[in-house]
Amino acid sequence: MTQKHGKNYVAAVAKVEAEKAYALNDAVSLVKEIDFAKFDASVEVVFKLNVDTRQADQQLRGAVVLPNGTGKDKTVVVFAQGDKAKEAEAAGADVVGAADLVQRIQGGWLDFDVAVATPDMMAQVGRVGRALGPKGLMPNPKTGTVTMDVTKAVSDAKGGQVTYRTDRDGNVAVPVGRVSFEEGKLAENIKSIAETVLKARPAAVKGTYVQHVSISSTFGPAVTLDINTL
């Protein structure tokens, strides 16, 4: 069944040249222009990569702190004990705990955006892996959320860090801010994640690595980016 789009979406699509790859600054300007949401919509960049995600060494996963943040205040929880718990509290973590935090999550509480854990807590955190995993909340060394440096982890999470990973089709989708952001700040954020994705190119990849890049707002149509302008 063909999905029907509303008149606002159709009008937005009409302003996008389907076969054109826009320079970064032009693409950002257009995405802001054609957004029709009645709220401050998120802006997302999507990279289509030439990777075989069936191979473990071609699965990308990591984190990057965007220079201008994401426009979202994140709630951060930290699994830690003793001095590391005090350190996390001092760093500004919203909730810090150990077995008590595990029990709270077992009870159904998942009202947070980022979970950080010290390595010694991972055995306990594993007890709630089935709750955290599907939500993308499971602490992981690759994203800097399993660490003894809880101060940095909390600071990064609060300061605009985003995580990225390839889906099964080789796509990497990352939020880079909001429509209300100045064009230059959105462009800087997009360049930052682009540099990170390019540096993460798996050694086994042959030929063209980045096949396509686009940006869009929450409900708006995608605008294709000229990769050479990133």
UniProtKB/Swiss-Prot annotation:
Disulfide bonds: none
The name this protein goes by in its record: Large ribosomal subunit protein uL1
Gene Ontology molecular functions: rRNA binding; structural constituent of ribosome; tRNA binding
Pfam families referenced in this protein's UniProt entry, alphabetically: Ribosomal_L1
Superkingdom of the organism of origin: Bacteria
NCBIfam families per record: rplA_bact (TIGR01169)
Complex formation: Part of the 50S ribosomal subunit.
Record's function text: Binds directly to 23S rRNA. The L1 stalk is quite mobile in the ribosome, and is involved in E site tRNA release. Protein L1 is also a translational repressor protein, it controls the translation of the L11 operon by binding to its mRNA.
Alphabetical UniProt keywords: Repressor, Ribonucleoprotein, Ribosomal protein, RNA-binding, rRNA-binding, Translation regulation, tRNA-binding
Matches recorded under InterPro entries: Ribosom_uL1_bac-type, Ribosomal_uL1, Ribosomal_uL1-like, Ribosomal_uL1/biogenesis, Ribosomal_uL1_3-a/b-sand, Ribosomal_uL1_CS
Entry annotated with the keyword Metal-binding: no
Entry annotated with the keyword Protein biosynthesis: no
Gene this chain is encoded by: rplA
